[in-house]
Amino acid sequence: NPSAFNSSIPKSYWESFTVTLRDSAFFDQMEKFTGNRAGTGGLVTFKDSNWLMSIVLYHQPHFLNQPEDVQVFWGYALHPDRIGNFVAKPMSECTGADILQELCGHLNFDLEAIEKAICIPCRMPYITSMFMPRAISDRPLPVPRNSKNLAFISQFVEIPDDVVFTVEYSIRAAQIAVYELFKVDREVPPINRWDQSWKVKFDAFVKAFT
């Protein structure tokens, strides 16, 4: 039932941005700030950001044939419809320069670190559509009941107890489809039920109040 997933862009969109730099000033400051060299740490999330902005610095070069003097990083925001902390408009209305101003505001970096940067925003209207509320009948099974030659693979098939928005979900859907249709005598890797872990539940409870 596609309408369960594509009927509300405001509830299912993020905005991302890609930044291209011609010098190492920003990466040098980030390494000093985080203690991690590019490509060795995870996301840097600004928890007090109205946009809930995150960035990640990849190991460089990130692209094939990327020039030695070029550095690239990526970021995104979960609430692009909200007014920024340092830019008085929603991210969805911002230019690349506005986004960089907001980013440097959170980092307390001088704008000179990115004054020659190219920042390209990208709106992703259905990026989290697979998380939209749904009925159990809104997603098909990877192999529908009684099907002999038809299967579905995607983030929009029904796999009980699994979590969407992961590579593993897509792989598991494909494995189920292939193994069932072709009678492959092999077990699909089991799903880790982290929601049943008392440690995970306790950590989530603590995090909710900190």
What is the meaning of each model-derived region?
Residues 196-210:
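Acidic, Ser/Thr-rich low-complexity intrinsically disordered segments
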Residues 1-194:
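C-terminal segments that line or cap access tunnels to active or ligand-binding sites in enzymes
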